[in-house]
Amino acid sequence: GSVIGAANNKQTIYASASAQGAGSATQNLNLSVADSTIYSDILALSESENSVGTTTNVNMNVARSYWEGNAYTFNSGDKAGSNLDINLSDSSVWKGKVSGAGDANVSLQNGSVWNVTGSSTVDALAVKDSTVNITKATVNTGTFVSQNGTLIVDASSENTLDISGKASGDLRVYSAGSLDLINEQTAFISTGKDSTLKATGTTEGGLYQYDLTQGADGNFYFVKNTHKASNASSVIQAMAAAPANVANLQADTLSARQDAVRLSENDKGGVWIQYFGGKQKHTTAGNASYDLDVNGVMLGGDTRFITEDGSWLAGVAMSSAKGDMTTMQSKGDTEGYSFHAYLSRQYNNGIFIDTAAQFGHYSNTADVRLMNGGGTIKADFNTNGFGAMVKGGYTWKDGNGLFIQPYAKLSALTLEGVDYQLNGVDVHSDSYNSVLGEAGTRVGYDFAVGNATVKPYLNLAALNEFSDGNKVRLGDESVNASIDGAAFRVGAGVQADITKNMGAYASLDYTKGDDIENPLQGVVGINVTW
């Protein structure tokens, strides 16, 4: 539990062998430190004159301790030799470098760490269940042996592990994620002839992840994997797409109100309120996968006009929604406030047409958590969205309560482009567009329960997102954040006229496609008419 030296006043522990006349001289120094804190440099010094051989051997054993200091070897004379062996064990930590003309060997065991502070040269480096951190400097070694070892590098620098001789064993390589692009030409581990080292690792830079790959020359490089998005890439893509996801869910919620009025025998318009929410899973064209958990409330009022050939329904609504987003190690949220206007036309022959328009304002925030301890970066921006929807269909009834309602719907949405920064790096998102088509059929049955009328139904639909080319850019790289393609939706719901002046409705849907899955999406509403 002792402290040797001080952080601002390091001591130097050294061994020296010198000889001038005939014969030779040898000096051995064995240092063993346990459960201590050491602020000291180590020096192995050997001096010879008149071709007299001198040898200095220093053996430094550190266990369960923190050591801050450098290790040096120094030879003076053609017959001088200095040897330095450093052995760290049992979760010891060393902060320092190795330099000099003599021989130096470093061994780390049982959870020990060497934080290299300057360019270091050793003859042999052995790592067992321990870590070498070369983020600050390069290490040159003659041989390298690793058993469950860890190498920490800075992939945005050119600090490397250079092995001139044989390298063997297994090694995990970590580099903290960053927003900087990685030089794929830098060999972060170079090996000598007949090496059998197996090294693996993944990091991220800019929009993509980089996998540690062994080249044809036997050296190891970080190579960009364009099929794996980085945390920063996933977040900026999700933040571009999430407001569109929320806006489309709000459009579905408003459509549920229009459907409920059409199914009701008593609803002549009035005041209504709906809760809506759902769990969504999306994957963009740029390989960003994210989950979105949305909850919201919509409040509206409308009136129904009866005509000779049917009816009109006109109304307005406002909604508030929040979507909690998670992607990779990062998270964020989207808050939206929207205003809606809608108009429905119902004909006595069963044909109906629904239209709606919306304007929304969306606030987006996120915490980008870079992999491998790269830190957390905050991002935020606001945007506005404009959307419209048209739906047409036909209601067939058999006169005994059964009804079938085929329909087709097309909705379009555009979000304003935005510019913001991630830790000083420019991010640009183009206008984000969504053009969503849907065709389906609703099958239900109408029956009475006491004084109430209940209409349960099943719904089956096919959807397709047509919009593509929604680009986002981080620095000098860009990626497609679109979620296009087909999906299928199956759901069930019920509409009930509880009294002459009150109704209620609810629906629950499941949607699945190649790039989308909504395992749960629902609406619950109540309306009062007069």
Locate the predicted segments by residue:
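Transmembrane beta-strands of outer-membrane beta-barrel proteins
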Residues: 271-273, 312-316, 341, 351-357, ...
